[in-house]
């Protein structure tokens, strides 16, 4: 959970912190001895959650080289290390740091560690801001480095990442609460929940299918393994002719008044295009999710709504007001809009929680009594206990800071709530609480919610509309299940074109086996919700099952029906 001591533990491994008592041995060296500081830091590479905390250069190449330069790597070797590290994370040496997305910056931080060639790599929530494909690339890279003999220590709240681990440690309130293999820990879901953790979606699927008799074991730790097991136990249910259903458009979407409209919006910095002819609308009272890879322009798009960024050309309307017009009342616009940035701790500034939350209401011309009332109600609404009211910000966990920032926005009673990656870095309990808060604000208070998220399973939980952005363009817009399904078809089409292969129906198969190659399929579906990933695999293998389901119960029922259990 947030605040359990994981990041503190990570800093001890790198000798950024020392314990008050006890012994810490790193590679056989006593971390308490002053002469071991440099040798330990050469051995242990550290990647933090927020890349801005460890980036110092203005150009990618310069930043990646910094660490290796400081341990006196010869120039010729340094150049090769930087080239290799950048190739591993897929970045160009000449890119400027300030032009990168949060995910792009995190790749720079990882490359900087790789260039130092450490024996141990500690990633402290380092994948939390990455899009699904970038996260998959980083985790695959870590597995490759592990095969080369490098020890990987991954601190994470993303339960799906635990599926890759050989050994898992659970921390709670500064203590080691559980440890063991994934099989051992995932067989104790109730105990995990005591510590604020939930089973990964993949494991939930395996357990639910085992309970319904679709598979005879619940120890399955990937959607690939689940699909293969279902095929092995129910081969008769799979058709020889394997086809995919055509995508459809959800025609039942409710028609509401358009609240936010983008008309042919473009944004360029010099020759670099950020947004390209963006046309979309967000309905009044709706819950809209914006998804897409890092660097697609999602955060930029969000910041245009309250006129924090102006487009190069095109028009943006909010409640009929053209915010791109020089005569627009921007102050009135911003009173309607609550905005939570990607790193919410950066918008907290007061001496304690209460003072931060009450600051906004105090500055909009209402009475002190009303301002205090709004602040206390907002703090209570986001589920923060009374004993945090007077706490300074540095005493709060990341999840608590996220809720303080949200409380400050809620206290302003906005019509629109815009959040950039509100779930990133939250533990399962914090994520669940955040989703409950957003759900209540949307359904009960009627607030229009717009979120940027990389969490597909969370998106399908509540969003009524999804916008998919890539390379500054909106490629898909519609109901979540339709958008994710069309993304799968689009991705397969793109991969087929790139690999100069032929499509058989809507599939790309390995010529020798007639099956999609595992790497191709895994890359194509990694942006999709976990349930849809499994259904697509089964459909490709020949099971006559719809690929449109995104919820656990309906997915399991569809598979049960298809295999005839």
Language model: regions and residue ranges:
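Helix-to-loop junction immediately C-terminal to a conserved catalytic motif
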Residues: 14, 306
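ABC ATPase NBD Q-loop/coupling interface
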Residues: 23-39, 315-332
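Conserved ABC ATPase "signature" region
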Residues: 76-93, 369-387
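Conserved ABC ATPase signature
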Residues: 96-104, 392-396
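Conserved catalytic motifs of ABC-family nucleotide-binding domains
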Residues: 117, 413
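Catalytic Walker B motif of ABC-type/P-loop ATPase nucleotide-binding domains
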Residues: 121-124, 417-420
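A short, surface-exposed alpha-helical micro-motif characterized by mixed small hydrophobic
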Residues: 161-163, 459-461
